[in-house]
């Protein structure tokens, strides 16, 4: 889900309400974890062994996987930011759902390195697909936890509705994971397709 955020906090005096303070702390914690995840991925990039183009060419698959993973994490950071800006309450369920999402995202750096070195093999590709699927499921759980906390008439609940794009992502990741055992290249194409789909702006939670 790609959400928009507003400028005001709804209390008219510019001060921060209790709910916004809670969601702000949760967002700050999550931002820190996501920053570490991206940093680890960058540290795991290896320079070409030689000084010619053939050495660089050998590292292109790993670089492409890094770009895909960076985009993947970046999309979740963007969506997570807008989702928490729209949320009003942070319950224990929301906190655990948020940690569940961060768990799956924390697997991305090690899987990025693995698949970058073995991009032709089914097991690393399928495992990467499982991490993508797990992250998508975890984000859906987080959304539902926020709706449960804020109520069925909340902004998040009203705006998201049946969430066709989210459901399509879950199905695509599941298919990509299964097809990794046939040919990893189809899986990569599906991973990219999901990323492209989420690049299209979705302003369901935009505020004036």
Positions of the model-derived regions?
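Multi-pass alpha-helical transmembrane bundle typical of ion/small-solute transporters
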Residues: 2-8, 12-208
């Amino acid at each position: 889900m790609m959400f928009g955020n507003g400028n005001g906090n709804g209390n008219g005096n510019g001060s921060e309400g209790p709910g916004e303070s809670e969601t702000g702390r949760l967002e700050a914690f999550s931002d820190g974890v996501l920053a570490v995840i991206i940093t680890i991925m960058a540290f795991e990039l290896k320079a070409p062994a030689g000084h010619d183009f053939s050495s660089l060419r050998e590292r292109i698959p790993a670089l492409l996987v890094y770009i895909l993973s960076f985009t993947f994490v970046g999309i979740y950071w963007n969506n997570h930011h807008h989702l928490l800006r729209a949320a009003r309450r942070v319950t224990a369920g929301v906190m655990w759902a948020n940690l569940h999402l961060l768990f799956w995202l924390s697997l991305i750096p090690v899987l990025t390195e693995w698949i970058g070195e073995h991009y032709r093999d089914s097991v690393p590709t399928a495992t990467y697909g499982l991490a993508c699927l797990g992250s998508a499921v975890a984000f859906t759980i987080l959304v539902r936890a926020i709706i449960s906390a804020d109520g069925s008439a909340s902004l998040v609940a009203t705006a998201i509705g049946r969430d066709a794009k989210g459901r399509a992502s879950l199905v695509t990741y599941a298919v990509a994971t299964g097809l990794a055992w046939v040919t990893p290249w189809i899986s990569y194409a599906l991973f990219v397709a999901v990323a492209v789909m989420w690049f299209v702006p979705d302003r369901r939670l935009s505020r004036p």
